[in-house]
Amino acid sequence: MDTHAPAPGPGRGWSGTVFCGVSLDGFIARTDGDIGWLEAPVPAGQAAPSGSGAEAVPDFEALLARVDHLVMGRATFQKVLEIGFWPYDPIQVIVLSSTLTGPQPHGALVAPDLSAAVALLESRGARGVYWDGGATIQAALRADLVDELVVTTVPRLIGGGIPLFGALEHDLPLRLRGSRVLDGGMVSTRYDVVREVSSG
């Protein structure tokens, strides 16, 4: 299975990955942060076969096996703590927050902003970074800190909520690596970020 991480972006020793579930209309959570719809039952029926390059699309376990750091926002961190199941050990979690202080559950580190998180990643010799949470993903994309996106589309329209993507200063071209159909009709698709190579 070719699920290796892409090469790091310019000036970085680590590759950045977005891995998330999204509704068909582009939301990662309802307005109040609820994500229960991600596991809601869908009508039974024959699913379409996986598309080209299905073997290149990592599942959650494969992703965790090739990252050593996870950066998420405070709201995402607190939502995971509420669930009561911590799936990230032994990955080092960094929480973006200007309000959290003192030791955090599961040894999570706190960075006040994105630039501080990047400095922390560099100082710790990170090799693979997983970006999670809407605002965090959007900030990482704007800062050119994402090299690959693995997006699982859930066959459900929720009509509004927290969007996966936000404003960008310029278009971000992507290269499709593969797609595969999961249980319940979900489709997981992997893209690599394409960076223009300077001719000069």
Regions found by a protein language model. Give the residues of each.
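Enzymes that bind and transform nitrogen-containing heteroaromatic metabolites
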Residues: 1-200
